[in-house]
From Swiss-Prot:
One of its GO terms (molecular function) is carbohydrate derivative binding. It is an enzyme of class 2 (transferase). It comes from the Bacteria. It is found in: Cytoplasm. PANTHER family: GLUCOSAMINE--FRUCTOSE-6-PHOSPHATE AMINOTRANSFERASE, ISOMERIZING, GLUTAMINE--FRUCTOSE-6-PHOSPHATE TRANSAMINASE (ISOMERIZING). Homodimer. Keywords: Aminotransferase, Cytoplasm, Glutamine amidotransferase, Repeat, Transferase. This is Glutamine--fructose-6-phosphate aminotransferase [isomerizing].
Length: 612
């Protein structure tokens, strides 16, 4: 959520800043802006519209400059309007953008008012701008005239999670950035330097990347950087050559990124499984062979779609590996009393590796005495990967659409391999069963292609869903989390209220909602619970509900009055959830398209939730 781009150069940097914002649009935003220093003055453009409109505004006002910052805002403090949009100015001296939340901003605001500062916005960001102005300009300030030192002094007073970028009107050679809980990277080019929330923002412009650590403050000049760490010591940070691909933010032949990413899943799974020859601990890092045999239980922490992948993994870990597993919503875990088990493996799951609630839960678990940690993540350079003992990197590639698709299925593949690795270590996986599982995993990409071929039938269903405002999703056992994920997808991009229940819970409440106007989506694999599920289907039919069933071919569930069936290509045993979630993604996508919603940027949602 939110995006920062900053630059100091010898050329007009506005086109690069705005292109950077365009590449960060996937993170979610409701306003955007850009500021530069030109002819000794601060100038800016802001809008509550899209980045394309900001570009038009900047061009029409002939905005240009060799130093600048830009921002996409996702409102937290203050409604989405131009006054609250970033960049914020303090006087005619300081320009600043900020991601995150300053928790003690009200106290700081009152202090600033008491010494004469006025506020134009309702944001916590303006407080930071004024604090830096005070440190940079006041005659009595020990850091007067030194922007790097001023920012280092100010961040010590801030409570919360943030990333900032700031420059001063009278110093057109320096941009300063700081991060605490929100990601920020530096990119170094030829006689120019950049700050960004994501290296993708400057892909193709600069490829020498520095990933700032927690608590770092950085001074950028055209020649390079100086970094001060959380203890205010000047330190060196490793420079890595990273080839981020700008093509990741191009649609190609697809209408939306979500559609593109749904159809990229066979490739994403193939890449994630590449080189897997068996289920050995070293899949999860060099220390895994030492750590995993000591583990007697698993604690999974995640949010949103990643939480549902964790719920699916619980079934695998307990049924295949016979290891007790607990799954917690990360935002809840850290605020309740728990009984820590030092022999548990804490598994954190996140596409970005920067999800604030999950990172906070990980840190809380470590404070409680959990020493064994594993990240399932799609970004190798993320905070989550850096802060865990073990890791498995999915290779989904950049995911732009807010509604996660390929990240989810690759997470499932990683978690399935974790279950099989534990099973092998604990003596529950024979060599023959390991070979069968490997063959199934290798066949997954082609099996997914067969599922994607069902799209025309799913489009026909979506036309009926377009006219509905509510939907129920049903699943049993291993496929209940898949029903939850299907309901989440439908509600977040089509704005249809959708809820998922274990099918056996119908008679305990949800059946009261079933009418002819209530579509009921059911996931029906040919597993041990099939006959129970068929009984639940009959309960819905008896109340006049309209059933939409994704059924394995050998279930003998037939389309008839009140029930429509799409046949899945094949039954895939324990891996069936990876196949069954894909038609639910397609159903949500085509329903949203038919309803005319903004599929890739649904209202009020952000891709990477980097504030609590």
């Amino acid at each position: 959520m939110c995006g920062i781009v900053g630059a100091v150069s010898t050329r007009n940097i506005v086109p690069v800043l705005i292109e950077g914002l365009r590449r960060l649009e996937y993170r979610g935003y409701d306003s955007c802006g850009v500021a530069v220093q030109r002819d000794g003055q601060l100038e800016r453009a802001r809008t509550v519209s899209r980045v394309a409109d900001l570009d038009t505004q900047a061009q029409s006002s002939h905005l240009d400059g060799a130093i600048g910052i830009a921002h996409t805002r996702w409102a937290t403090h203050g409604r989405p309007d131009t006054v609250n949009a970033h960049p914020h100015f303090s006087g005619d001296t300081i320009a600043l953008v900020h991601n995150g939340i300053i928790e003690n901003y009200e106290t700081l605001r009152e202090e600033l008012k008491a010494v004469g500062y006025g506020f134009e916005s309702q944001t916590d960001t303006e407080v930071v701008a004024h604090l830096i102005h005070q440190a940079y300009t006041y005659p009595s300030s020990a850091t007067r005239g030194h922007l790097f030192a001023s920012v280092r002094a100010v961040v010590k007073r801030l409570h919360g999670a943030y990333a900032i970028a700031v420059f001063a009107r009278d110093n057109p050679d320096v941009v300063v950035g700081a991060r605490a809980g929100s990601p920020l990277v530096v990119a170094l080019g030829d006689n120019e330097s950049f700050l960004a929330s994501d290296a993708l923002a400057v892909a193709g412009t600069a490829n020498r990347i520095v990933y700032l650590e927690e608590g770092d403050v950085v001074e950028l000049t055209r020649e390079g950087l100086t970094v001060a760490d959380a203890r205010d010591h000047v330190v060196e940070r490793e420079v890595k050559v990273v080839e981020a691909h700008a093509a990741a933010v191009e649609l190609g032949p697809y209408r939306h990124f979500m559609q593109k990413e749904i159809f990229e899943q066979p490739r994403a799974l193939g890449d994630t499984l590449e080189g897997v020859q068996g289920f050995a601990p070293d899949l999860f890092g060099p220390r895994a062979a030492e750590v995993l045999p000591k583990v007697d239980s698993v604690l999974i922490l995640a949010c949103g779609t990643s939480y549902y992948s964790g719920c699916t993994a619980k079934y695998w870990l307990e049924s295949i590996a016979k290891i007790p597993t607990q799954v917690e919503v990360a935002s809840e875990y850290r605020y309740r009393d728990t009984v820590p088990n030092p022999n548990a493996l804490v598994v954190v799951i996140s596409q970005s590796g920067e999800t604030a609630d999950t990172l906070a839960a990980l840190r809380h678990a470590r404070e409680l005495g959990h020493t064994h940690t594993l990240a399932i993540c799609n970004v190798a350079t993320s905070a989550m990967v850096r802060e865990t003992e073990l890791r498995f990197l999915t290779r989904a590639g950049t995911e732009i659409g807010v509604a996660s698709t390929k990240a989810f299925t690759t997470q499932l593949a990683a978690l399935y391999m974790l279950a099989l690795t534990f099973a092998k270590l604990r003596g529950h996986l024979k060599a023959e069963a390991e070979e069968v599982a490997l063959r199934q995993l290798r066949h997954l990409p082609s099996a997914l292609n067969a599922v994607l071929a069902l799209e025309p039938q799913i489009i026909a269903w979506s036309e009926e869903f377009t006219r509905r405002e509510n939907a129920l999703f049903l699943g049993r056992g291993l496929h209940f989390p898949i029903a939850m994920e299907g309901a989440l997808k439908l509600k977040e991009i089509s704005y249809i209220h959708a809820e998922a229940y274990p099918a056996g819970e119908l008679k305990h409440g949800p059946l009261a909602l079933v009418t002819e106007q209530m579509p009921v989506v059911t996931v029906a694999p040919n597993d041990a619970l099939l006959e129970k599920l068929k009984s639940n289907i009959q309960e819905v039919r008896a109340r006049g509900g309209k059933l939409y069933v994704f059924a394995d071919a050998d279930t003998h569930i037939q389309s008839s009055d009140g029930i429509q069936v799409i046949r899945m290509p094949e039954h895939y045993g324990q891996l069936s959830p990876i196949l069954h979630v894909v038609p639910l993604q397609l159903l949500a996508y085509h329903t949203a398209v038919a309803r005319g919603t903004d599929v890739d940027k649904p209202r009020n949602l952000a891709k990477s939730v980097t504030v609590e």
